Amino acid sequence: MYLFLDTANIEHIRRAAKLGVVSGITTNPSLVAKEKCANYRDFIQEICSIIDGPVSVEALSQDAAAIIEEARDIASWASNIVVKVPITDQGIEATSQLSREGIKVNLNS
Protein backbone atom coordinates (compact mmCIF):
# COMPACT_ATOMS: atom_id res chain seq x y z
CA MET A 1 0.00 0.00 0.00
CA TYR A 2 1.14 3.53 -0.76
CA LEU A 3 0.12 6.48 1.40
CA PHE A 4 0.44 10.00 0.03
CA LEU A 5 -0.12 12.96 2.32
CA ASP A 6 -1.92 15.88 0.63
CA THR A 7 -0.45 18.87 2.45
CA ALA A 8 2.24 21.51 2.44
CA ASN A 9 2.40 21.80 6.23
CA ILE A 10 6.04 21.15 7.10
CA GLU A 11 5.29 20.03 10.65
CA HIS A 12 2.68 17.51 9.46
CA ILE A 13 5.14 16.21 6.87
CA ARG A 14 7.92 15.86 9.47
CA ARG A 15 5.63 13.95 11.85
CA ALA A 16 4.38 11.64 9.11
CA ALA A 17 7.93 10.99 7.88
CA LYS A 18 9.03 10.18 11.42
CA LEU A 19 6.30 7.53 11.64
CA GLY A 20 7.63 5.97 8.45
CA VAL A 21 4.22 5.37 6.88
CA VAL A 22 4.17 8.07 4.19
CA SER A 23 5.15 7.10 0.65
CA GLY A 24 5.08 10.64 -0.72
CA ILE A 25 3.49 14.08 -0.70
CA THR A 26 1.07 15.84 -3.01
CA THR A 27 0.88 19.61 -2.95
CA ASN A 28 -0.86 22.36 -4.82
CA PRO A 29 -0.50 26.15 -4.83
CA SER A 30 -3.43 26.72 -2.46
CA LEU A 31 -1.94 24.34 0.14
CA VAL A 32 1.44 26.06 -0.13
CA ALA A 33 -0.19 29.51 0.11
CA LYS A 34 -1.77 28.53 3.45
CA GLU A 35 1.73 27.99 4.82
CA LYS A 36 2.80 31.55 3.95
CA CYS A 37 6.18 30.53 2.58
CA ALA A 38 8.63 33.27 1.60
CA ASN A 39 10.10 31.43 -1.40
CA TYR A 40 8.10 28.75 -3.24
CA ARG A 41 11.11 26.90 -4.64
CA ASP A 42 12.93 26.81 -1.28
CA PHE A 43 9.74 25.64 0.42
CA ILE A 44 9.24 22.76 -2.03
CA GLN A 45 12.91 21.81 -1.73
CA GLU A 46 12.51 21.63 2.05
CA ILE A 47 9.59 19.22 1.64
CA CYS A 48 11.67 17.15 -0.79
CA SER A 49 14.49 16.94 1.75
CA ILE A 50 12.13 15.54 4.40
CA ILE A 51 10.46 12.88 2.24
CA ASP A 52 12.44 10.31 0.26
CA GLY A 53 9.46 9.39 -1.91
CA PRO A 54 7.72 11.35 -4.66
CA VAL A 55 6.63 14.93 -4.04
CA SER A 56 3.98 16.10 -6.51
CA VAL A 57 4.26 19.78 -7.44
CA GLU A 58 1.71 21.44 -9.71
CA ALA A 59 2.54 23.27 -12.92
CA LEU A 60 0.15 26.19 -13.39
CA SER A 61 0.62 26.87 -17.10
CA GLN A 62 -2.14 25.97 -19.53
CA ASP A 63 -0.57 25.64 -22.99
CA ALA A 64 1.78 22.78 -23.86
CA ALA A 65 4.91 24.85 -24.48
CA ALA A 66 4.54 26.78 -21.22
CA ILE A 67 3.75 23.59 -19.26
CA ILE A 68 6.90 21.97 -20.64
CA GLU A 69 9.06 24.96 -19.71
CA GLU A 70 7.56 25.22 -16.22
CA ALA A 71 7.78 21.46 -15.63
CA ARG A 72 11.46 21.37 -16.62
CA ASP A 73 12.16 24.10 -14.08
CA ILE A 74 10.14 22.46 -11.29
CA ALA A 75 11.71 19.05 -11.95
CA SER A 76 15.18 20.57 -11.56
CA TRP A 77 14.48 21.54 -7.94
CA ALA A 78 14.87 18.00 -6.53
CA SER A 79 15.24 14.45 -7.81
CA ASN A 80 12.05 13.21 -6.15
CA ILE A 81 9.69 15.76 -7.72
CA VAL A 82 6.77 14.59 -9.83
CA VAL A 83 5.21 17.43 -11.82
CA LYS A 84 1.42 17.62 -11.70
CA VAL A 85 0.08 18.56 -15.13
CA PRO A 86 -3.56 19.34 -16.01
CA ILE A 87 -5.38 16.52 -17.80
CA THR A 88 -6.27 18.62 -20.83
CA ASP A 89 -5.29 18.24 -24.48
CA GLN A 90 -2.42 20.67 -23.86
CA GLY A 91 -1.39 18.86 -20.68
CA ILE A 92 -1.38 15.48 -22.39
CA GLU A 93 0.69 16.90 -25.25
CA ALA A 94 3.16 18.32 -22.73
CA THR A 95 3.24 15.04 -20.80
CA SER A 96 4.26 13.15 -23.92
CA GLN A 97 7.30 15.40 -24.37
CA LEU A 98 8.16 15.50 -20.67
CA SER A 99 8.04 11.70 -20.45
CA ARG A 100 10.46 11.43 -23.37
CA GLU A 101 12.79 13.71 -21.40
CA GLY A 102 12.56 11.50 -18.32
CA ILE A 103 10.59 14.02 -16.27
CA LYS A 104 8.15 12.31 -13.91
CA VAL A 105 4.57 13.51 -14.46
CA ASN A 106 1.25 13.06 -12.70
CA LEU A 107 -1.84 14.06 -14.68
CA ASN A 108 -4.62 15.59 -12.60
CA SER A 109 -7.85 17.48 -13.06
What does each of the following model-derived ranges do?
Residues 3-5, 9-14, 19-22, 27-106:
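Active-site beta->alpha loop and helix N-cap motifs at the rims of alpha/beta catalytic domains
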